[in-house]
Amino acid sequence: MNLIFLAGASGNTQFWNPLIEQLPNNYTKQVIAYPGFHGTAAHPDIHSFDDLSNYVVAQIQQPSILIAQSMGGIFAIAATLQKTDLIKGLVLIATSGGINLERFKVQDWRQLYRQEYLESPDWFVTTKVDYEEFLSTIEIETLLIWGDQDPVSPIEVGQYLNQI
């Protein structure tokens, strides 16, 4: 089985290395880098969040389980909705999953993100993705992993996603 790893908003693909090193060799492991993020060269056709999402989804070309953290979970949901024949499972770690987080009174990550990642495009933090109405159509096995001390994606978000 192919395992595809999607990083959070930093785009740091090395985030996954400690986990990947522990996995058996019979899994194919693919880490998708985000063009223009964390030292990955920019792509001339990526000018919006939708462009980046479409780029990520286009990288998935064989049956796979997606393992995604934070912002990567939004790309994983997009891929699952668009490539139902190829996505065989989801592991979502502390992600919004594309729902509106206002009801959860979460800490806004955008200001701190802008200060830390000055090179990131403005559209990355201003875009609001809403997949909530489509989440109930996802029928594949999904594992939700949350920490109970996360101010950006608190455990209540994971509990809510589990109910959908």
Predicted regions and their residues:
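Conserved HGGG/HGGXW glycine-rich cap/lid loop of the alpha/beta-hydrolase fold
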Residues: 1-41
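The conserved beta1-alpha1 loop
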Residues: 4-8, 69, 146
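Active-site loop/oxyanion-hole signature of alpha/beta-hydrolase fold enzymes
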Residues: 21, 30-65
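Flexible "cap/lid" loop of the alpha/beta hydrolase fold
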Residues: 45, 49, 77, 81, ...
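Gly/Ala-rich beta-loop-alpha elbow adjacent to hydrolase catalytic centers
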Residues: 68-76
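Active-site nucleophile elbow and catalytic-triad environment of alpha/beta-hydrolase enzymes
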Residues: 118-134
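Short beta-strand/loop motif that positions the catalytic acidic residue
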Residues: 138, 144-146, 150
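Conserved alpha/beta-hydrolase "acid-adjacent" motif
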Residues: 151-157
